[in-house]
């Protein structure tokens, strides 16, 4: 995982209430926090470290709030240099729409992950589509946590475009495959 993404996740943790923040940091461990924070943002951290941080957050806040934390994380990541230029270029080409960004989701995936599967997006209507992740190494990590994280990232994409909408898991397999149904509307 790109260090910038794990750093954005840790920044989102810092915005949580003090009690939750302290529990999460204690579970993660100071050495892991420092390793992530000290890394160059463009470098890659082991996926095991990133998932350890993610799992500790989920263990404290639960599944629903984990999606919210990831929404905040991705909004922070969109504002960092690594993704800001990508988003600017994509919105210049496709316009600032969820569909335009979702069509480029595999490129974002390639920018921030390694060996974490691939994403495909299919538009199913003017303001809806499906996004499918295949090939995530679910046998190595807690897949439910990653599924929630991606859902939060998709929600952040909708919010970035100044739209409202929903992201629902419609299919999830133990083999590292998940499909999301996404709907959005302007304003």
Which residues are covered by each model-predicted region?
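Short, mixed-charge aromatic SLiMs
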Residues: 30-37, 78-81, 173-185
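Intrinsically disordered or highly flexible coil/loop and linker segments, enriched in small
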Residues: 18-22, 33-34, 99, 111-118, ...
């Amino acid at each position: 995982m790109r260090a910038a993404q794990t750093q954005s996740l840790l920044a989102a943790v810092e915005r949580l209430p003090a009690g939750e923040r302290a529990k999460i940091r204690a579970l993660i461990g100071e050495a892991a926090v420092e390793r992530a924070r000290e890394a160059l943002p463009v470098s890659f951290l082991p996926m095991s470290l990133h998932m350890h941080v993610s799992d500790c957050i989920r263990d404290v806040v639960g599944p629903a709030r984990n999606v919210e934390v990831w929404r905040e994380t991705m909004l922070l990541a969109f504002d960092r240099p690594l993704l800001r230029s990508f988003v600017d270029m994509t919105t210049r080409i496709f316009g600032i729409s969820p569909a335009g960004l979702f069509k480029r989701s595999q490129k974002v995936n390639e920018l921030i992950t390694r060996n974490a599967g691939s994403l495909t997006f299919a538009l199913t209507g003017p303001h809806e589509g499906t996004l499918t992740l295949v090939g995530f190494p679910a046998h190595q990590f807690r897949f439910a946590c990653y599924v929630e994280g991606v859902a939060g990232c998709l929600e952040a994409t909708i919010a970035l475009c100044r739209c409202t909408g929903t992201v629902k898991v419609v299919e999830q397999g133990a083999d590292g495959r998940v499909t999301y149904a996404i709907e959005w509307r302007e304003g």
